[in-house]
């Protein structure tokens, strides 16, 4: 059985100024609030959905 957890590194590359309020809340939920801030999160369905919502503001890398 493979217990390896897939992680993704998410970096905010654009500002949330001018974005909808729910997109700003999504960034905060991902742990991002400043440009060039990065977080490493588990690659779960809920995280994938949040990333998809604000993908135009992010850079995503598999780890």
Curated annotation (Swiss-Prot):
What processes in GO biological process is this protein linked to? translation
One GO CC term of this entry? cytosolic large ribosomal subunit
* SUPFAM superfamilies (UniProt xref): Ribosomal protein L30p/L7e
Q: Which UniProt keywords apply?
A: Ribonucleoprotein, Ribosomal protein
User: What would be one Pfam family of this protein?
Assistant: Ribosomal_L30
Gene Ontology molecular functions: structural constituent of ribosome
- For this chain, the annotated S-S bridges are none
* Superkingdom of origin: Bacteria
Similarity comment: Belongs to the universal ribosomal protein uL30 family.
- PANTHER family registered for this protein in UniProt: LARGE RIBOSOMAL SUBUNIT PROTEIN UL30M, MITOCHONDRIAL RIBOSOMAL PROTEIN L30
Quaternary structure annotation from Swiss-Prot or TrEMBL: Part of the 50S ribosomal subunit.
Instruction: Identify this protein by name.
Output: Large ribosomal subunit protein uL30
Protein source organism: Rickettsia typhi (strain ATCC VR-144 / Wilmington)
């Amino acid at each position: 059985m493979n217990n390896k957890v897939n992680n993704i590194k998410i970096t905010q590359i654009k500002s949330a100024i001018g974005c909808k309020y729910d997109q700003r809340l999504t960034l905060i939920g991902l742990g991002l609030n400043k440009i060039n801030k990065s977080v490493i999160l588990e690659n779960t369905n809920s995280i994938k959905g949040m990333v998809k919502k604000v993908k135009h503001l992010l850079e995503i890398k598999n780890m």
